[in-house]
Every structure is written in C-alpha cells, then in structure tokens.
Amino acid sequence: MNRHIFTYLKRNELTDVGLVNRLFISAFIQHYHLMPQRNALLCKYVIAEESAEYEKLQAFDAQLSRYGCEYSLEDLTELFEFVISPSDRKISGAIYTPKAIRERIVDEVIRGLDQTQLLHKRFADIACGCGGFFLTIAILIHQQTGKKFADIYRDNILGVDIQPYAIERTKLLLALLALMNGEDENFDFNLYVANS
C-alpha cells in the first residue's frame, strides 16, 4: 500500500471504526465495480450517493487514484491493520503479517496433504486479527480443490479474536473475496469474538 494513503488516513484522523469500515469497503466495491445484492453484511457497508459520508468516500477514492493504488484485497487487509489504534495494538498484539510470510506458513502447514485431506481439514487462528491468514487459506483451498468459498468458510475455517471489529473485518474481507469470485450470498462463518 502506498505510504501517501497512510499519510492521508493519519491526517484525516479517521477513528470511527464503523466509518472506516464503510469507507474502505465502499471504495473497494466502487474500485472493482462490484455491487453486492444478496450479501447483507456487505450491503450494510455500502455508502450510498445520498449519504453524508459519500463526500469522504469520493475524497478517499481520489487519493487511491492519485497515487495509482491497485487496492487489492491485500491492500485492504493492510489498511485494516494500519487503522488499529496504538492502544489496541499494544493490548491485542495486533501486527500485519505480509502475504509472502503467510503463504510460506500456509504452505508448510498443508505440505503433504492430498486434495481430499485439504477439502476436509479445518484451519484455526485463535488471534485472527483482520483475517489475512484466512484469505490465504481460502484462496489456496479454492484454487487446489475448486471448493466454493461459502463451503470453505463453513467447513474449513475457525477464527477467534478479542476485538469485535477484527472479527467483523475478517468477515468483510472473506465476503469480498467470495464476491470477486461470483459468490454473492450470506455466509456461515465460524468466527467468534472471545479471549483466547
């Protein structure tokens, strides 16, 4: 993610979790010309043109365009981690794990599993943060087995985090991943707010 975007976010002191989530999700949906119809979670985060927040969305989107940001799911994951307050970061130990490191860890975990085992294996992250590891795992299972994301979320993923916003952001990221792959539905997530 471009450092200018981080500077923009700091300068505008975006601290309201709900607004930040709506802003990031709406910008992502707008950027990729997506429009969820059936996924109630994503629909809840879309900023409408008549909304008072629409001007902030346009300003944020202009920054993304100005600095040529791809605004991938990976960028969105990094942004979600960036806006965690320093006090929350200290309490929860939240830290962004880069994609390359996540991929290496996941590769180590699944090494030796055949396709049938991968279809039925359950992956847990008991301090899942914004769900970066689950993005990596879901993509890998989908690519190697063809399993629908809805089924992966229901059968293969179990996550816990102490912060409610982290679980919400994990759900949002996974829902966007599915939407980008043609799955626009409500999902049964095994993601829970708890102190592990």
Predicted regions and their residues:
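SAM-dependent methyltransferase catalytic region
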Residues: 37-44, 49-50, 55-62, 66-67, ...
